[in-house]
């Protein structure tokens, strides 16, 4: 079946989802969760085949870890669907309303996008998360995962489709595109009029390709060259703890800090304990000459280092002369994801927040908090680094648009 045919089926399914009740959608989510647990052995067999093929192809340990499933991970994925069912349904929510002078009742309400396309890399959990959040928000979804997870995704989507159909909603609410050819990606990116929005989740190269080549509207997510700036008025112990957590709590996420900027006034106090903490955690520091004075283990930082989203046990560190210099550095190298300042100065915090252009700005907190769950939004489809249509963690409301409903009693203009 071609991508166009799948997209047409998705549009038909989306029409049914648009009028489905919350009870209908929540029942489908619970059925999906139960089916994943019941058919775990089938899913793990497919995943085992993907892992074996990946090892033969020389995939890195990090990629294999993201690809791997076990019974515990499948149970966690199922639990995430149940938690999704407990979240409020965004569709039909009244965003604003008023009675006009002529007596017309005006309401702006949330409605589903319709058909959402998602292109992503070797994370089978994204297959289920994306299917769940799209269904909950009333959208049909077209999933295009990576070839390295092809067998796992086929098994997962088979389970999900059977479960959805068993509750009376269309099986075509969830569809998987062929991952063995790049043609499916090209067709999906050009299915304007059939696909309402495209969301890429993955590395910089994937996101750049989709943004540059798609004719379907795109919500750009993900790439995070995040900074922690330690201000002249920072508490040293707090600064070291935040920098260490932001870098090492999890290395391979888009909200992980990749750069540490330290005001020259506190460099001698902050850098020795910070460098020692990074060394103890196995993190390689790429630093400017002022940083290298404090440790022979520091590697020289290049312009490329400052621009790199490492997603590994590496961090670039630079000493800056002022808050102005820190902001200028972030403007040059940042990706608009998450930036943090550590300071006891309210005026410095206000200035940093006002001047830094990012989806999230942290004051005396780790960059790792930029997350739908941590923000209390529940499920998220990704973290948008653009300004239209959504910015920051994208929860259920961000997978909707709005329509105006005007109710009258025979008014004429």
Curated annotation (Swiss-Prot):
Location(s), subcellular: Cytoplasm
Annotated source species: Salinispora tropica (strain ATCC BAA-916 / DSM 44818 / JCM 13857 / NBRC 105044 / CNB-440)
Keywords recorded for this protein, A-Z: Amino-acid biosynthesis, Cytoplasm, NADP, Oxidoreductase, Proline biosynthesis
Broad enzyme group: oxidoreductase
Protein name: Gamma-glutamyl phosphate reductase
Record-level Gene Ontology MF annotations: glutamate-5-semialdehyde dehydrogenase activity; NADP binding
Function of the protein: Catalyzes the NADPH-dependent reduction of L-glutamate 5-phosphate into L-glutamate 5-semialdehyde and phosphate. The product spontaneously undergoes cyclization to form 1-pyrroline-5-carboxylate.
Record flagged with keyword Oxidoreductase: yes
PROSITE patterns: PROA
Pathway(s) it belongs to: Amino-acid biosynthesis; L-proline biosynthesis; L-glutamate 5-semialdehyde from L-glutamate: step 2/2
One biological process term in Gene Ontology: L-proline biosynthetic process
Enzyme Commission number(s): 1.2.1.41
InterPro entries: Ald_DH/histidinol_DH, Ald_DH_C, Ald_DH_N, Aldehyde_DH_dom, G-glutamylP_reductase_CS, Glu-5-SA_DH, GPR_dom
Gene3D superfamilies xref list: Aldehyde Dehydrogenase, Chain A, domain 1, Aldehyde Dehydrogenase, Chain A, domain 2
Family recorded in the similarity comment: Belongs to the gamma-glutamyl phosphate reductase family.
Gene Ontology CC: one annotated term: cytoplasm
Catalysed reaction, written as an equation: L-glutamate 5-semialdehyde + phosphate + NADP(+) = L-glutamyl 5-phosphate + NADPH + H(+)
Entry-linked Pfam families: Aldedh
Origin: domain of life: Bacteria
């Amino acid at each position: 079946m071609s991508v166009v045919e799948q997209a047409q089926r998705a549009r038909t399914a989306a029409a049914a989802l648009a009028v489905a009740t919350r009870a209908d959608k929540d029942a489908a989510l619970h059925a999906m969760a139960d089916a994943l647990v019941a058919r775990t052995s089938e899913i793990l067999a497919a995943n085992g085949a993907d892992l074996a093929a990946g090892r033969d192809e020389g995939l890195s340990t990090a990629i294999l870890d993201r690809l791997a499933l076990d019974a515990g991970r499948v149970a966690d994925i199922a639990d995430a669907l149940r938690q999704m069912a407990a979240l409020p349904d965004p569709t039909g929510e009244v965003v604003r309303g008023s009675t006009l002078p002529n007596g017309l009742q005006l309401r702006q309400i949330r409605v589903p996008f319709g058909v959402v396309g998602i292109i992503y890399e070797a994370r089978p959990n994204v297959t289920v998360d994306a299917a769940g959040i799209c269904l909950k928000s009333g959208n049909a979804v077209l999933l295009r995962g990576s070839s390295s997870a092809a067998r796992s995704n086929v098994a997962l989507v088979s389970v999900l489709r059977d479960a959805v159909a068993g509750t009376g909603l269309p099986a075509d609410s969830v569809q998987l595109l062929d991952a063995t050819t790049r043609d499916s990606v090209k067709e999906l990116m050009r299915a304007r009029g059939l696909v309402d929005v495209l969301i890429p989740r993955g590395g910089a190269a994937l996101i750049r390709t989709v943004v540059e080549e798609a004719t379907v509207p795109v919500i750009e997510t993900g790439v995070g060259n995040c900074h922690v700036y330690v201000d002249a008025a920072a508490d040293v112990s707090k600064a070291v703890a935040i920098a260490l957590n932001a870098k090492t709590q999890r290395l391979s996420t888009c909200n992980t800090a990749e750069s540490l900027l330290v005001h020259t006034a506190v460099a001698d106090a902050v850098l020795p304990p910070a460098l020692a903490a990074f060394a103890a955690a196995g993190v390689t520091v790429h630093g400017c000459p002022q940083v290298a004075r404090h440790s022979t283990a520091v590697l020289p930082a290049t312009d490329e280092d400052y621009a790199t989203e490492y997603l590994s046990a590496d961090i670039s560190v630079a000493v800056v002369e002022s808050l102005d210099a820190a902001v200028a550095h972030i403007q040059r190298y940042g990706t608009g994801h998450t930036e943090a300042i550590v300071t006891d100065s309210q005026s410095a915090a206000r200035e940093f927040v006002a001047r830094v252009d990012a989806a999230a700005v942290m004051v005396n907190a780790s960059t790792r908090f930029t997350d739908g769950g941590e923000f209390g939004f529940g499920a998220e489809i990704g973290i948008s680094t653009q300004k239209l249509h959504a910015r920051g963690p994208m929860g259920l409301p961000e997978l909707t648009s709005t329509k105006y409903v005007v109710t009258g009693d025979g008014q004429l203009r």
